[in-house]
UniProtKB/Swiss-Prot annotation:
A GO CC annotation given for this chain: chromatin
The family this protein is said to belong to: Belongs to the MAD2 family.
Record's signal peptide: none
Physiological role: Required for DNA damage induced mutagenesis. Involved in DNA repair, mitochondrial DNA repair and translesion synthesis. Has a role in the bypass of abasic (AP) sites.
Main location: mitochondrion
Gene that encodes it: REV7
Disulfide bond positions: none
Record domain HORMA: where: 3-203
Pfam families to which the protein is assigned, alphabetical: HORMA
Organism encoding this protein: Saccharomyces cerevisiae (strain ATCC 204508 / S288c) (Baker's yeast)
Subcellular location: Mitochondrion
Name of this protein: DNA polymerase zeta processivity subunit
Length: 245
C-alpha cells in the first residue's frame, strides 16, 4: 500500500465516521468527547464517541477496509431508519482513483495532505450542519463497501485452531461482510412509489496518491412511511422529503 494512503487515510476515516455519527444523532451528543481529538489542523476538535465497544468497532472497521483497499472503490456510511431498516441517507467516499503503489518521483508534503483533508472534512461538516435534525433513537448506521474481485468467506474453518489475535482478525475480516444488492429492502408492491434521491457533491481530496471523491445522497421522495418520525424539523417551505427544486 502507498505509504501516504496508509498513514493518513486511517486518521481521515476516523474523523469522517465520527462526524457523521455525531451530526446525524446516531448516538446521543453526550456520548462524544469534544475536547481531545484534533486532526489536519481543523479549527475545531472532532467529536469522538467515548463508548469503548464503538471505539474498537470503528478502529477495526477502518483497518478492515484498509486491508481490502486495492479491491474497494467505494466506502459508505448508510443512515438506516430503525422502523423499516431502509437507508434514508448515504455518505460516500469514492476511492476509484486512489494510487496504491508508491512512485519514486512522487513528492508531497504533510502540509499538502493536511490542507486537502481539512477542506474535505470542513465540506462534510458544513453539509451536515444544514441537514434537518434527526429525532433521538430513530436511526442506526451500516458501513458498506463496493468492491471489485474481492473474494470473502473462504478462510472460515470451524475446525481451525486460532492461536493469535492477528489470526482471529484475519478470519473475521474474511467473514464479517454480507453481500447485498442496491435497494433490496424496498417494499415489493405495485403501490410503492420509487424513491427519488438528492445527490450532493462534497469536497474530496486531490493530492499525490490521495485522490478521493466525496458525495452524499438523501432520500427526498417516496412512500411517506419511509421517513415518518425520523426528522424533527425542516427548512421553511420544505416537506418531510425535502424539495425537488
Amino acid at each position: 500500500m502507498n505509504r501516504w494512503v496508509e498513514k493518513w487515510l486511517r486518521v481521515y476515516l476516523k474523523c469522517y465516521i465520527n462526524l457523521i455519527l455525531f451530526y446525524r444523532n446516531v448516538y446521543p451528543p453526550q456520548s462524544f468527547d469534544y475536547t481531545t481529538y484534533q486532526s489536519f489542523n481543523l479549527p475545531q476538535f472532532v467529536p469522538i464517541n467515548r463508548h469503548p465497544a464503538l471505539i474498537d468497532y470503528i478502529e477495526e472497521l477502518i483497518l478492515d477496509v484498509l486491508s481490502k483497499l486495492t479491491h474497494v472503490y467505494r466506502f459508505s456510511i448508510c443512515i438506516i431508519n430503525k422502523k423499516n431498516d431502509l437507508c434514508i441517507e448515504k455518505y460516500v467516499l469514492d476511492f476509484s482513483e486512489l494510487q496504491h503503489v508508491d512512485k519514486d518521483d512522487q513528492i508531497i508534503t504533510e502540509t499538502e495532505v493536511f490542507d486537502e483533508f481539512r477542506s474535505s472534512l470542513n465540506s462534510l461538516i458544513m453539509h451536515l450542519e444544514k441537514l434537518p435534525k434527526v429525532n433521538d433513537d430513530t436511526i442506526t448506521f451500516e458501513a458498506v463497501i463496493n468492491a471489485i474481485e474481492l473474494e470473502l468467506g473462504h478462510k472460515l474453518d470451524r475446525n481451525r485452531r486460532v492461536d493469535s489475535l492477528e489470526e482471529k482478525a484475519e478470519i473475521e475480516r474474511d467473514s464479517n461482510w454480507v453481500k447485498c444488492q442496491e435497494d433490496e429492502n424496498l417494499p415489493d408492491n405495485n403501490g410503492f412509489q420509487p424513491p427519488k434521491i438528492k445527490l450532493t457533491s462534497l469536497v474530496g481530496s486531490d493530492v499525490g496518491p490521495l485522490i478521493i471523491h466525496q458525495f452524499s445522497e438523501k432520500l427526498i421522495s417516496g412512500d411517506d412511511k419511509i421517513l415518518n418520525g425520523v426528522y424533527s424539523q425542516y427548512e421553511e417551505g420544505e416537506s418531510i422529503f425535502g424539495s425537488l427544486f
